[in-house]
Curated annotation (Swiss-Prot):
Residues that, per the record, bind NADP(+): 166, 198-204, 221-222, 226-228, 291-293, 315, 341
Protein name: Thioredoxin reductase 1, cytoplasmic
Organism (species): Rattus norvegicus (Rat)
Post-translational modification comment from the UniProt entry: ISGylated.
Subcellular localization, as worded in the UniProt entry: Cytoplasm
Annotated FAD binding sites: 18-23, 42-43, 58-59, 63-67, 131-132, 161, 200, 334, 341-343, 472
Disulfide bonds listed in the record: C59-C64
Cofactor: FAD
A Gene Ontology biological process term: benzene-containing compound metabolic process
Cross-link (Cysteinyl-selenocysteine (Cys-Sec)): C497-U498
Family named by the database record: Belongs to the class-I pyridine nucleotide-disulfide oxidoreductase family.
Amino acid sequence: MNDSKDAPKSYDFDLIIIGGGSGGLAAAKEAAKFDKKVMVLDFVTPTPLGTRWGLGGTCVNVGCIPKKLMHQAALLGQALKDSRNYGWKLEDTVKHDWEKMTESVQNHIGSLNWGYRVALREKKVVYENAYGKFIGPHKIMATNNKGKEKVYSAERFLIATGERPRYLGIPGDKEYCISSDDLFSLPYCPGKTLVVGASYVALECAGFLAGIGLDVTVMVRSILLRGFDQDMANKIGEHMEEHGIKFIRQFVPTKIEQIEAGTPGRLKVTAKSTNSEETIEDEFNTVLLAVGRDSCTRTIGLETVGVKINEKTGKIPVTDEEQTNVPYIYAIGDILEGKLELTPVAIQAGRLLAQRLYGGSTVKCDYDNVPTTVFTPLEYGCCGLSEEKAVEKFGEENIEVYHSFFWPLEWTVPSRDNNKCYAKVICNLKDNERVVGFHVLGPNAGEVTQGFAAALKCGLTKQQLDSTIGIHPVCAEIFTTLSVTKRSGGDILQSGCUG
């Protein structure tokens, strides 16, 4: 497509950002520091149930923030149980109040939404709650929720539209099921819940719902946590099952029917085996779909301006400077092909892009060795390669895996979950036993992983880990004493906190 044809002679803005999520807002605020005229277009298409939210994108409204807060609610429930062993006397049976939790979480989210609005205003970034769609070179149509249309032009555009939950395309899914977009503001307790999917979203939601006392079943098509280390994924699944979460494996729903309307009501789920003709039926109050997410790229006019997308996935291929095949259009965040779908990655990419475009910087976003955490009941933190990827990249004979179970001191008094927490480092034997994969399953896994991620960036070796003196008695010290290799088949069970 010829960019100059029909392009305006002058522009309304230096940069228009489509999407007011973490990445888009980070880029907007950074570009504004260089006295650039910046606009953010953000519009939330309501879910099939009508749920919508404010400025800030998935993470703040229907992702990391409410998820972590509800995970904390579940952890507090466990802490209350443990407290009896520490001398606390709880006279009454402790009950959980769903409505109070969601009200508190939504109040916090509302304060964040407002904070983003204020921050944009202070930085003189123009914000419009409108749906952006390209209509020609350097031109975009913004449509608000009343259908009013305005056309704006810009020298450059940044696509940061993110993703939304996928539906199954079966009878009753959009009519009767909820997604993570609905769950965190659900005005009633979901009751007996079926979670469909095995993504980190599915397992995190199943975990905190069970943690606050609900009857939870997870329906899994194939494997847990695809793309993550499968040794760790299976340990997570085992722990969840031991704590009362039921798993229906190798089944997919084929039909959702309403038996009784209400809040929550009753639903009948019919499911079919993925490897036989067997079908099953069961009743649930709520069905939560967490079967993946689709990029919001197909209805924003990209074909009009010639931006190429992966037709199968909707993802946008970009250069190492986040530039699409159309030179004046850039993209960041979850919509990028082959990149990690994580909030801090989008924020980093957005900031660095603005610094390169307007501040003379040459620093690019480093997508390697990015740490992340799955907030399942037993948290999983990781950085670098999974065991499978390490074998694929270096060969099984060229890696050494050091591992051990461990027992957090705080859990010894209530005497629970011994030899469930697990630590593993994967080393490249051909490169001075450099650590290429870091994995931890246990409490505060994110806090443990963050510091080690910096060490991995600096080229951490096993010898350096061994020469580091641990802090006692904490979970992270296990990484300074790992001595048993998987190859050896040696015993990795722990009998106490000092052994």
